[in-house]
């Protein structure tokens, strides 16, 4: 119990240190007038300098630890440098824009909308639809929203610092988890390696990145907890801490349940697979009764995870039990080329491919003799099993989104690769101590080479962060902004005419970034893939299509008043041909790729040519507002 409390205290300390490093660094970066990343190499150059400084600092921290003095200071230094590495890798390239990777486009649009909703109110609500509980896990967005509300920062503007800070916190906690299990110097190596890979492949989705970097130590700890009844000389943790790791595994799964559904499902799948493999081995060795222990531990994990996950999932499940649900599984209706095949990162001819291949070989050699290796091997196999199941489920007209587990697979293999590199160097050093110096030099050079290329890999996402128009109507590259620069005028007009706060107004628009910047409710979401199943996306789309066949304002008002959902009172549209106003909507066409087909709905201008509507042009937009009853 004392060890568990000490570990918890170290995790809290790691979160505090990471938050402090991120806050100070991001504030310092924001105070300088930088050139835009796409048009200048200065930010990339400074990122490289910062990365080299952090990697050198970690090397020095490892030396201090090995010297046997100031070990608490060495741990603190390790937390500072892994945190600083994360911040400089993401924060420096984004230094001249207020937007995060991928700007306010596509997926980031609905994520920003969710953050805006939970900034406006702490209540757990759907991002778009009035009166519905959330379907997508709100954990990351709720905390970010509370930070935004506390600091008085617009949600869209807090997205970048919160994304970077949250990933930094996860990386720091990862270091703490590893140093609980392995030597501190090795914990530094595996943490910085997995952090770098996570930043490359998972950082555009910050809440997924947090779980991805935490998965390897969490799964190793879980495997140790499940196996704690066995008396093996090489197990990572002792038997007395077995139930502490079970509790920790339950907390991690519960955390994943409130954070990201797909990685929750994968982690649960992996833990169940671990339990079944262990129970089978115990049954063969000691009889059927021996299987009770891992099953009992699995039950404990499930109970803890379910209790935590219920905080965010219970409102939706309770509502879904009696309300109609449409487009069930639409979120899984996506099958890109990566989802149609198995990924083998260890076969890439690159630095990353080499470390993944080394990790694969280490797993094969050490699985039978190392708890770490066996845990990682099962986790890797679970990714491939999940991918095969995902391909098979296409027969049922859905998928398991296996392509989104490719960063997870890579991080697991890199984790194994670091352990393989360490053990290979140690084995060779028995014959010549100079091998350790050579290995250190190779490792440092490889780390610098891989890290400094991260901004290049992220360049497309970084470019969009500079070319999208932010909530102030400005672009990070200081070029003429897009039509979003008129959003402030639309917002002012809506507030003036309706006389209602934003969270009491439902808007129908195809320019969904308006809902990302301002906490209005939407009548229809971006696509069915992001829509709450309780919202009946398909029926709403059919209703909008029917309005295009109406001819008078009275018919439209009658149609609005008889809707089974809160009707829109604000319409943000574009001018169409032949005296019409247009909305460009989306339809799910899975299994085709692209999985979304855009179509245009033309609403006759005559529907709004009535004293009960206030209609005006604002930039390229047509704003039609249904006047309150007393003003009509």
From Swiss-Prot:
Keywords: Cell membrane, Cell wall biogenesis/degradation, Glycosyltransferase, Membrane, Transferase, Transmembrane, Transmembrane helix. GO terms for cellular component: plasma membrane. The chain crosses the membrane at residues 10-30, 45-65, 76-96, 162-182, 184-204, 206-226, 242-259, 263-282, 298-318, 344-364, 375-395, 409-429, 434-454. The keyword Transmembrane applies. Pathway: Cell wall biogenesis; cell wall polysaccharide biosynthesis. Residues 455-632 are extracellular. It holds the Pfam family AftA_C. One of its GO terms (biological process) is capsule polysaccharide biosynthetic process. InterPro entries: ArabinofuranosylTrfase_AftA_C (IPR020959), ArabinofuranosylTrfase_AftA_N (IPR020963). Belongs to the glycosyltransferase 85 family. Involved in the biosynthesis of the arabinogalactan (AG) region of the mycolylarabinogalactan-peptidoglycan (mAGP) complex, an essential component of the mycobacterial cell wall. This is Galactan 5-O-arabinofuranosyltransferase. It comes from Mycobacterium leprae (strain TN).
């Amino acid at each position: 119990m004392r060890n568990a409390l000490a570990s918890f205290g170290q995790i809290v300390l790691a979160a505090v240190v990471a938050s402090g490093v991120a806050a100070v660094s991001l504030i310092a970066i924001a105070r300088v007038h930088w050139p835009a990343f796409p048009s200048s190499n200065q930010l990339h150059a400074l990122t490289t300098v910062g990365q080299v400084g952090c990697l050198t600092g970690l090397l020095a921290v490892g030396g201090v630890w090995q010297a046997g003095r100031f070990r608490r200071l060495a741990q603190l230094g390790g937390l500072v440098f892994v945190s600083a590495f994360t911040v400089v890798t993401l924060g420096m390239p984004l230094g001249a824009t207020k937007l995060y990777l991928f700007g306010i486009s596509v997926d980031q649009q609905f994520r920003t909308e969710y953050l805006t909703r939970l900034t406006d109110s702490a209540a757990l609500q759907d991002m778009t639809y009035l009166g519905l509980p959330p379907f997508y896990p709100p954990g990351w967005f709720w905390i970010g929203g509370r930070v935004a509300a506390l600091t008085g920062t617009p949600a869209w503007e807090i997205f970048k610092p919160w994304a970077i800070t949250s990933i930094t916190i996860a990386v720091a906690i990862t270091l703490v988890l590893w140093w609980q299990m392995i030597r501190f110097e090795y914990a530094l190596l595996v943490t910085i390696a997995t952090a770098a890979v996570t930043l490359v492949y998972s950082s555009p989705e910050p809440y997924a990145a947090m779980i991805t970097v935490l998965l390897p130590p969490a799964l190793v700890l879980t495997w140790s907890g499940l196996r704690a009844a066995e008396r093996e000389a090489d197990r990572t943790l002792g038997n007395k801490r077995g139930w502490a790791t079970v509790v920790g595994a339950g907390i991690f799964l519960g955390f994943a349940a409130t954070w990201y559904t797909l990685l929750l499902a994968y982690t649960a799948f992996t833990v169940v697979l671990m339990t079944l493999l262990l129970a089978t081995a115990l049954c063969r060795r000691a009889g059927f009764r021996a299987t009770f222990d891992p099953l009992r531990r699995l039950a404990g994990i499930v109970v803890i995870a379910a209790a935590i996950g219920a905080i965010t999932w219970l409102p939706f499940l309770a509502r879904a039990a009696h309300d109609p649900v449409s487009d069930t599984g639409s979120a899984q209706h996506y099958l890109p080329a990566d989802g149609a095949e198995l990924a083998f990162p260890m076969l890439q001819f690159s630095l990353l491919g080499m470390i993944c291949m080394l990790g694969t070989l280490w797993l094969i050699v050490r699985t039978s003799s190392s708890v770490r290796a066996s845990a990682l091997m099962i986790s890797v196999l679970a990714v491939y099993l999940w991918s095969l199941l995902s391909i098979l489920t296409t027969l049922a007209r859905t998928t398991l989104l296996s392509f989104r587990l490719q960063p997870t697979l890579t991080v697991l293999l890199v984790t194994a690769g670091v352990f393989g590199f360490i053990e290979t160097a140690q084995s060779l050093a028995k014959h010549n101590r100079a091998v350790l110096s050579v290995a250190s030099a190779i490792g440092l050079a490889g780390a610098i080479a891989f890290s400094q290329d991260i901004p290049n890999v992220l360049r497309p996402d970084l470019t969009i962060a500079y070319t999208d128009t932010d909530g102030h109507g400005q672009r990070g590259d200081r070029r003429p902004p897009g039509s979003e620069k008129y959003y402030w005028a639309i917002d002012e007009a809506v507030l003036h005419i309706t006389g209602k706060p934003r969270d009491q107004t439902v808007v129908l628009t195809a320019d969904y970034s308006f809902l990302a910047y301002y906490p209005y409710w939407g009548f229809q979401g971006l696509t069915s893939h992001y829509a709450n199943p309780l919202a009946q996306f398909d029926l709403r789309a059919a209703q909008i299509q029917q309005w295009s066949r109406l001819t008078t304002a009275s018919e439209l008002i009658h149609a609005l008043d008889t809707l089974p959902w809160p009707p829109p009172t604000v319409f943000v549209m574009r001018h169409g041909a032949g005296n019409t106003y247009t909305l460009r909507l989306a339809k799910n066409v899975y299994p085709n790729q692209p999985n979304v087909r855009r179509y245009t709905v033309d609403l006759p201008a005559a529907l709004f040519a009535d004293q009960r509507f206030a209609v005006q042009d604002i930039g390229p937009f047509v704003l039609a507002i249904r006047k309150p009853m007393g003003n009509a």
